Amino acid sequence: MNLYSALRAITDTPDATFLRTPQGRTLTYGDLAAGSARFANALVALGVRPGDRVAVQVEKSPEVALLYLACLRAGAVYLPLNTAYTLNELAYFIGDAQPRVVVCDPKVEAGVATLADAVVTLDAAGQGGLSDLAAKQAEAFDTVARDGADLAAILYTSGTTGRSKGAMLTHANLASNASTLVKAWRFSAADVLLHALPIFHIHGLFVALNVPLMAGAALLYLPKFDPDAVLRLLPEATVMMGVPTFYVRLLQDARLDAALVKGVRLFVSGSAPLLAETHQQWAAATGQAILERYGMTETGMNTSNPYEGPRVAGTVGPPLPDVSLRITDADTGRALPRGEIGMIEVKGPNVFAGYWRMPEKTAAEFRADGYFITGDLGLLDNDGYVHIVGRGKDLIITGGFNVYPKEVEEEIDALPGVIESAVIGLPHPDLGEGVTAVVAAAAEAGLKEAAILRLLTTRLAGFKRPKRVLFVDDLPRNAMGKVQKAALRDLHAGLYAAPASPRKDAG
């Protein structure tokens, strides 16, 4: 089953609008069929065969959507790459994935050509060698038959835990997750999704493209997140998907109010934790509750707060239909009762086929009964909602006690003047790890380290309280808004290092 064949609106409603840009450019579903056929024929002309990888590092444009669909139709494996990656980083991905063709921006073509044999270009305006070749091709293409277990895409993990791993996603993985979300979030052909996300990531690509494609919905397609453009277009939208940073920035604009978003039926947040404070502020400003969900590169979406029913701030909702989720002891795999923190494990048709060229790593990440070990810590409450506590790697063990960073962060974030915080463990000569808070605070608040430590004395047990508080203007984030705690740990690794003792002469 080729995923493209499940996107029935492309053939069933060719005159319906699929995509509109702020500049007024429009693509219908019929344009998708014709354009993706041209691009598929172009890929075949470049030597792409079923199962070949096509690496894509280009700026967002309507042509990228056509290229993605063309890869599906040609039976190729789509491999999107973050546009921020340097040539040095690209060398790893290209060397690992061995793509048949690399599609890149013309500005980096010369460098990429030193890494790959077949390189074609596509710029932010949708122009370049690939689009020129596609323009010469026929508007008909026989979509290649694929089995559900065949690979549709490889997405490399963000690398926050070390070397990036290529998550292999099948046609069945992507089709099942899109179908589940269409039902869970009540998508229909009447919807208009405001799309301001990048499309090299699972959120912007497989959630915010596949779901509307499967429902026959339309997109307001922005090249990137721009608050002015979003606020201007929100009255025309029925759904918006974003990362927490989007919502935080929109809340800073006085134009945001209930009247502006009266036509929007759903705001979705993901890719990074949404602060409960942001959830509450958004509801106060707009009268609507953001729907937070939980997913990852390897699985697509696993849980979602309900479309109908309470959307609980600080949770990511119950497991989606067809997804089995349990909380376990990380060492033994023993299932834990509700309310206890442990490792989140999931199983379902959404779960990936494994890591590209890493069979040992793949085997290590799955239990014998097929559950995938996510690496995320959390708990199930009595209502069946999942609470994410943090990454397992972020757990701090200080003096033999376990400290969950999110618990400490929530207390710090609640302090007046604090914008946000990240709590990390750093090597400590006495405790093993020292709890350390990195805080972004409002300049006018005049917060001091001693004041924060004093305020936390009545809020947290002594072993949970930070040994130090460090102030920064902004927390480092990756392209999807996740705080890069690994970078903070590397930067401050020597904070508690004991000064070298002067050597005493013998005698």
Describe the role of every protein-language-model region.
Residues A175-V192, F200-V239, D253-R255:
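Conserved AMP-binding/adenylation subdomain of ANL enzymes
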Residues R326-E345, A364, N382-D383, A445-E449, ...:
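Conserved beta-loop-beta connector loops within the AMP-binding
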